[in-house]
């Protein structure tokens, strides 16, 4: 996968893109990353990238010209671009809130271009002409789009095949299936009077899976209950959710397993 970032502070990406999972993905050739300095595409003498807003108001607005030229250099002519293979994303508070589902969607692209704004934003003609979608990482204001871009990159890269040492890690993390992740423990089993759950020490794989699933329901209900609203659950999960709620001190009825319907036209054996 190729990821390009447009920013006036490319040096902000030097450390985070060189270490841990992202750094290893680059070393393996799984990820190609470039941070492009928007100032390099300016045509004015002083390499200015901003000007006062039309209509007045506080702050400065980033010019369209350097972004247009940078995007054309990276992606080629607008009219020839295939949005199914590459996508241009503007990081902005006005965008849709980023999610694990969106990260998985973006990880299937060949190329992702992230635009980092500053000041009062970017001339809207950039959005109209080039941007495929707008993404926000939450309902709060940051100084620029660089930190949100790093969040998106981290979430996307870890989903690329081969990026993680254990491919099951991404499948079991929070939000991978709409639930928060279960609690984790490691050695020693007894630490300062606090014991690790016996289920995790039993060696019984089915019991471990059941405990983890139930704890995921507990944690989700306690911290993000909205994730459970309207969620269709198979019967086994319905039982685990009810047990989890009971263990939290709530009144929940354990569902009974539905009886199989007898096929029509067949008489019961005597």
UniProtKB/Swiss-Prot annotation:
Location of this chain's protein in the cell: Cytoplasm
Alphabetic keyword roster: Cytoplasm, Methyltransferase, S-adenosyl-L-methionine, Transferase, tRNA processing
EC number: 2.1.1.228
Reactions the enzyme catalyzes: guanosine(37) in tRNA + S-adenosyl-L-methionine = N(1)-methylguanosine(37) in tRNA + S-adenosyl-L-homocysteine + H(+)
Gene3D superfamilies tied to this protein: 3.40.1280.10, tRNA(m1g37)methyltransferase, domain 2
A GO cellular-component term linked to this record: cytosol
Keyword S-adenosyl-L-methionine on entry: yes
Disulfide bond annotation, renumbered to this chain: none
Pfam families listed in its UniProt record: tRNA_m1G_MT
Swiss-Prot/TrEMBL GO biological process terms: tRNA N1-guanine methylation
UniProt-recorded Gene Ontology molecular function terms: tRNA (guanine(37)-N1)-methyltransferase activity
Keyword Transferase appears in the UniProt entry: yes
EC supergroup of this enzyme: transferase
UniProt: S-adenosyl-L-methionine binding residues: 117, 137-142
Family: Belongs to the RNA methyltransferase TrmD family.
Matching PANTHER family: TRNA (GUANINE-N(1)-)-METHYLTRANSFERASE
Subunit structure, interactors included: Homodimer.
Function summary: Specifically methylates guanosine-37 in various tRNAs.
Protein name: tRNA (guanine-N(1)-)-methyltransferase
Record organism: Heliobacterium modesticaldum (strain ATCC 51547 / Ice1)
């Amino acid at each position: 996968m190729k990821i390009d970032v447009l920013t006036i502070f490319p040096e902000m990406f030097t450390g985070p893109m060189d270490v841990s999972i992202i750094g290893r993905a680059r070393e393996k050739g799984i990820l190609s990353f470039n941070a492009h300095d928007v100032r390099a595409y300016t045509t004015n003498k002083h390499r200015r990238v901003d000007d006062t807003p039309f209509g007045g108001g506080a702050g400065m607005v980033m010019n369209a010209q350097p972004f247009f030229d940078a995007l054309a250099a990276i992606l080629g002519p607008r009219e020839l671009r295939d949005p199914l293979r590459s996508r241009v994303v503007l990081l902005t508070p006005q965008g849709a809130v980023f999610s694990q589902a969106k990260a998985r969607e973006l990880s299937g692209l060949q190329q992702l271009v992230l635009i980092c704004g500053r000041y009062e934003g970017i001339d809207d003609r950039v959005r109209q002409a080039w941007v495929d979608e707008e993404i926000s990482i939450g309902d709060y204001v940051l100084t620029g789009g660089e930190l949100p871009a790093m969040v998106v990159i981290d979430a996307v890269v870890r989903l690329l095949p081969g990026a993680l040492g254990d491919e099951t890690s991404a499948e079991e993390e929070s939000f991978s299936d709409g639930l928060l992740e279960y609690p984790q423990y490691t050695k020693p089993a007894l630490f300062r009077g606090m014991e690790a759950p016996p289920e995790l020490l039993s060696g019984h794989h089915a019991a471990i899976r059941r405990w983890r699933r139930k704890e995921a329901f507990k944690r989700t209900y306690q911290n993000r209950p909205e994730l459970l609203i309207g969620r269709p659950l198979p019967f086994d999960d319905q039982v685990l959710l009810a047990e989890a709620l009971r263990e939290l001190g709530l009144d929940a009825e354990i569902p009974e397993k539905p009886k199989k319907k007898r096929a029509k036209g067949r008489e019961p054996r005597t």
